[in-house]
A protein has these predicted regions:
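Arg/Lys-rich amphipathic alpha helix in sigma70-family domain 2
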Residues: 54-74
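Sigma70-family region 2
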Residues: 31-47, 67
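Residue-level preference for hydrophobic side chains embedded in well-ordered alpha helices
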Residues: 4, 8, 12, 33, ...
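A short, charge-rich alpha-helical start-of-domain segment used by transcription regulators
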Residues: 1-12, 24-27, 43
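Hydrophobic recognition helices of helix-based DNA-binding modules
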Residues: 12, 37, 60-64
Length: 76
């Protein structure tokens, strides 16, 4: 399971870095994607690359939303 995720780590980091512009934030998103991957039943994933791409993209979009609207983060 870890080896499979690790084969996509560079790809996921590149997506997150392009979206966020920060290596530290990109690494955080990769780690969060891994946690989501860990807690998802593997038999429900039909395409690992598509699943991981969707997760990291949505996480980055959420991060960008909070960067633009920090007052919403305070309410969470």
């Amino acid at each position: 399971m870890v080896e499979t995720f690790e084969s996509y780590r560079t790809y996921l980091f590149a997506i997150a870095y392009r979206m966020l512009g920060s290596a530290m934030d990109a690494e955080d998103m990769v780690q969060e994607t891994y946690l989501r991957y860990q807690t998802t039943p593997k038999d429900s994933i039909t395409s690992l690359k598509a699943f991981l791409t969707t997760i990291i993209t949505r996480l980055c979009m959420d991060q960008l939303h909070f960067m633009v609207n920090p007052e919403k983060l305070a309410r969470v």
